[in-house]
Amino acid sequence: KTTTAFKLASKYVLASKKVMVVSLDKNRSHANSQITAFTNQYGVIFKEAESYLECMELVETSGVDLAIFDTQGCGQYDWSEIESLRAFTQQFEFLETHLVVSASMKDVDIFGTVQHFSSLNVQSLIVTKVDETISLGVLANVSFKTPLLISYLSTGPSFQKDFSVATPKEIAKRILMEHNQQEYQVLRRLANT
């Protein structure tokens, strides 16, 4: 999720926006070289906070165009953490909430994740690790079977070229390309025998 937050930040920086990423992850030290390199390269402000009040103070005093909150990760069955996230998100007047899921997850797991995080008023999904699976039918299934749009696709480690807006055309192209790839055809035959 943290890498995804920075990829999203880079999109806005390239559009000449002043961006801040605020980490609310209490379980991890963010003083790592990847974050330092990214903030130096793109000019993204990076801060850590522990509460809504700290977040609001950071946003109000920073003069940024966009603040991206990188919340602590939690599993779909961690009800107390989901409730904490819900309580946090409800305090904001203007907040767009994206749920980050992996393309390599099974459909049932993504549907369960969407259901369990629905109390957060999630507006869309960001699908990561698109490059790590050859079975992208999950993108179509999620699009048809959940009320959420897929907003972004993450297809690799590059902050700029491997993160894009998810359009219906792009999703359809990826699914159709998947079915025509020789490796996919071989694995599909093996799975059906």
List the predicted regions and their residue ranges:
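Switch II (G3) loop of P-loop NTPases
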Residues: 19-30, 39-81
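Conserved catalytic-core segment of NTP-binding enzymes
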Residues: 51-60, 76-181
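Short, charged, intrinsically disordered terminal tails
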Residues: 176-193
